[in-house]
Regions:
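Hydrophobic structural segments
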Residues: 1-94
């Protein structure tokens, strides 16, 4: 398992399943004879969009707090580019 990388991503609750489906389809989450392996926990993220940002949630200049999941999974090094591309396509944030 030395060729495995760990991916950690924060996802709004509304897009949790879509993001996981995308990264799993691209090759993440396989450990031995198991697939779709991940660890997740619900928390609260916060941010303030600065001028020039196009926030998915909230408005520029306002502090936002949103329910987000921290998702951790593993992926083979060879799948890194595909998993990152799938993550960017499925994730709603800029």
């Amino acid at each position: 398992m030395s060729d495995l990388l760990k991916l950690t991503v924060y996802v709004p609750a509304s897009h949790l399943d879509a993001v996981k489906d995308a990264i799993f389809a691209a090759g993440a989450g396989r450990v031995g004879d198991y697939d779709r392996c991940a660890w997740q926990v619900l928390g609260e993220g916060q941010f303030r969009a600065l001028p020039g940002a196009q926030p998915f949630i909230g408005t520029v200049g306002a502090l936002e707090q949103v329910a987000e999941y921290r998702v951790e999974t593993v992926l083979p090094r060879a799948a890194l580019a595909a998993v990152v591309a799938a993550l960017k396509m499925a994730h709603p944030y800029e």
